[in-house]
Structure formats: structure tokens, C-alpha cells
Amino acid sequence: MEFSVKSGSPEKQRSACIVVGVFEPRRLSPIAEQLDKISGGYISSLLRRGDLEGKPGQMLLLHQVPNILSERVLLVGCGKERELGERQYKDIIKKTISTLNETGSMEAVCFLTELHVKGRDTYWKVRQAVESTKDSLYTFNQFKSNKPETRRPLRKLVFNVPTRRELNLGEKAIAHGLSIASGVKASKDLGNMPPNVANPAYLASQARRLADDYETVTTKIIGEEEMKKLGMTSYLAVGQGSHNESMMSIMEYKGHPDPAAKPIVLIGKGLTFDSGGISIKPSEGMDEMKYDMCGAASVFGAMKALAKLNLPLNVVGVLAGCENMPSSNSYRPGDILTTMSGQTVEVLNTDAEGRLVLCDALTYVERYEPECVVDVATLTGACVVALGHHISGLISNHNPLAHELINASEQSGDRAWRLPMAEEYNEQLSSPFADMGNIGGKAAGTITAGCFLSRFAKKYHWAHIDSAGTAWVSGANKGSTGRPVSLLVQFLLNRSGQENEE
């Protein structure tokens, strides 16, 4: 699909469709007023008859409006003008795209990017419109024998910006939005793949393909034999019940003018299926445990977006892939594992496996002497209890890094909330037989999981994002969300100084 920006008055647009906003109660936006004036009051007369109230998401498609060059005009309900916020704006864009796609408008000029959204500029509105459009059009039907096809799909979308001075900003927003949307799609595709396809070897193949596609990326795969030599006993223990080999995929992106510049490291938990192991999960909803690799999927998506953007950074992306299955070879509650760091862990629950994989990955990346490390994991059900399905959890040992990530989450709309990591929580991890247990009881489960990981991240600035509540949705529209790719890429854009430069 093709995106572009232009600056011009609506009456001069010759397109299949012009998209303009209508506010409650039946009040035309400034652009819609211009069209109404040219049409001799045709649009306002329809509103007076009650054809459209202006409620958020309402749509009214008009054909052959008098004196308008375009074939159609789509009126989009935007709610009350002063209450148009970020979430409502993105929802309106998605509904608009669905309507255009269903009605056979193969091209459109969209004036919704001129609407006032509280606290947001043209760059944000155009970029979010691109990301929301791609999100709205996303499908995952690789395994369906009959694939539905849109007869006349939307192929070209032009966003109008208020002034010619903002054209460069709009083009930058489109470039950023397309790169991020590409990363989100890659993350969604990985997450939605069934676990009989997307095993650790499949993750590794995707990492290799990224290196084939971009000369700035090199990929290395660490299998079980090398893990044994490295002393990654904890990581290996989690996967030893599965016939699928554990594999850690390491993608190195070098875009910094100084190749020796310290890298930012992103680590993703890649449990391609998590049965819980010997501490087996309930059968209801277990199919969704294919999404336990969404942390790795989001890191992969962020690396793809990074390569597309060609940012002047050095970044290492780690996909910590393995599978947690019950068998006679599985690790057990009561086992004591010696981690790569030398610290010992008593296994109290084999379903708290993500931290046992991540702890060795966190130790492994010390060799890069990183500028900072961010790990992403669908780690705890406790995070869903604490924050629900809208906001990811964030824990960090470095205040400035935490603030950077929270700021990036607000900028991108992919929100995170910082949780405390006070010393007292560490007491819940104590074990009479090892340096620590792998769980800290029912209370503050997200925080104690973060405290566990922090013990392996003492040599660098570190943050942990728990996306257990945000990485996928359940129900009729079940599927991966691609989060927190947008947050991660915004963080990298900010680090590179290219967040919204004109």
C-alpha cells in the first residue's frame, strides 16, 4: 500500500474519496465546512436531516456531491471536538480504513490528520495514522484453505497536512510509521505462528533471514552444545523436556559511525510453547501459550524496524528460544540449578521458567559491555492482575533508563508503567538450599520476578518490560498485538536523535 502527504484545499482534490471529520452534535470540521460551502450546503442539509450525528466511529459515504471533483466523500464521526484524544483518534483511523476497504475506494485523500488531537503534532498524527492503517489491514490467514479477498482493496492513501512547511515532517512520519508497522507485522506473524511451526529453530531461521536481507545485520546461533560449554545450565534445564533443541539467536546491528561504540542490547523471552513443564498449566487456554515467545517476537520486530530505519546505533537483539514441556527428561520442582553467573537457584515451580532462561541470557550479554540492556518477556500472570491488558509493566535498576522508556511509551502510545523494586521484595526469593528460589510467593509476583532478574544485571543499566497482559488478545479476535515493538523503536529513535526531526 502506498502512502504520501500533500498540502492543499479539499475542493481541488481529484480522488476516489475524500475523508473529512464531523463532530458532535452534527458539526462540520473546518475542512468539511469548506466542502459544504462548495457543494451549496449539500452536506450540512444531510446532517440537519439526522443522517449523521458525529458520534465516534460513525460513517456516512456520499456519492457525487455537487461541485466536488472527487467521486465520493466519507464523513467520519469524531465525537466532541475538545475530547478527541489519542486512543479515539487511532480508533477513528482504523474504522475509516475498514470502511474504505469495504466500499471499494482504492485511493483516498484523508484530512483527519488535520484534526486537533490534544498534545499531539502533525508528525504524531501522520505516523499514528500509518501505523493504525497497517494494523487495521493486518490479517493472518496462512493456514486457511480458503483465503477471503477484498475485491477492490485500498491501495493508496494521501494524508493532508495544514501547511507546506509540514510536508517534510509528514514524509518523515510516514517513513517512521511504515518501518514500525513492518516491525509490528513481523512480531505479530511470529507470535501467531502455531507452535508446531514456530519452534526455537524457526526463530533462528527468521534471525538468519534478517541478516540475509540487511547488510547492517549479522546473526549468530548458539545451540545446546555451545550453551553447555558456556555454563548456561539454567537456560538448558528449561528446554531439556522437549525434543526441540533450545537455540539462542543473536542479531547484531551495526549502524553507528564508530563500529566499536557500545551497543544497546534487547533480549526477548522466546518460549515457543510453555506447557508449564512438570508444574503443568490448566488445559483451558493452553493453546495461547504459543504466545509465550512474544517477547522474542517483539525484539525481532524492533530489529527489523531498526534495520529499515538505518539508525546510527549499534544494537544487539537476542531471541532466547526454547520450549517448556513435561517428559521424563524435564527439570523438576526441587532441582537446584547453577546459572551461568555462578549463582544457584532452587526450582520451586517449573512454570516460572522464563526467568531461568533470561537470567543466563542476561549474563551472556555482559561480553558486549552494553550501554544498556532491555529485556522483554510475557513473564508473569501477576502483571495482568496488576495492570490488565492495556499497559505493560516496567522494572529497572537505573532511573534515567526507566524514564527514557516511559517517555518512549507515552510518545508511541504503547504504554508502560514503572513498578517499584525495593530491597524488601528480595526477601521473598530466599531459599534454605540455594542462593534464591525461582518464585517469591503470590504477593507482588511481577516485582519479585523483576528482583530475580536484577540479580543477573548488576554490571550494566537494565530494564525489564513485562508484556504478559499486552502481547496478545484473547477471544473472538485472538491474536498477537506486536507490542511493545512501537515502544522499543521509539526508544531507539530517541537514542539516535531522530525521533521527529524535520
Swiss-Prot record:
One of its GO terms (cellular component) is cytoplasm. Presumably involved in the processing and regular turnover of intracellular proteins. Catalyzes the removal of unsubstituted N-terminal amino acids from various peptides. Keywords: Aminopeptidase, Cytoplasm, Hydrolase, Manganese, Metal-binding, Protease. Pfam families: Peptidase_M17, Peptidase_M17_N. It is found in: Cytoplasm. Belongs to the peptidase M17 family. Mn(2+) 1 binds at D274, D351, E353. Binds 2 manganese ions per subunit. Mn(2+) 2 binds at K269, D274, D292, E353. The lineage of its organism: Bacteria, Pseudomonadati, Pseudomonadota, Gammaproteobacteria, Vibrionales. One of its GO terms (biological process) is proteolysis. Its cofactor is Mn(2+). The gene is pepA. Its EC number is 3.4.11.1, 3.4.11.10. This is Probable cytosol aminopeptidase. It is an enzyme of class 3 (hydrolase). It catalyses: Release of an N-terminal amino acid, Xaa-|-Yaa-, in which Xaa is preferably Leu, but may be other amino acids including Pro although not Arg or Lys, and Yaa may be Pro. Amino acid amides and methyl esters are also readily hydrolyzed, but rates on arylamides are exceedingly low; Release of an N-terminal amino acid, preferentially leucine, but not glutamic or aspartic acids. The active site is at K281, R355. Its main location: cytoplasm. InterPro entries: Leucine_aapep/pepB, Macro_dom-like, Peptidase_M17_C, Peptidase_M17_leu_NH2_pept, Peptidase_M17_N. NCBIfam families: PRK00913.1-1, PRK00913.1-4. GO terms for molecular function: manganese ion binding; metalloaminopeptidase activity.
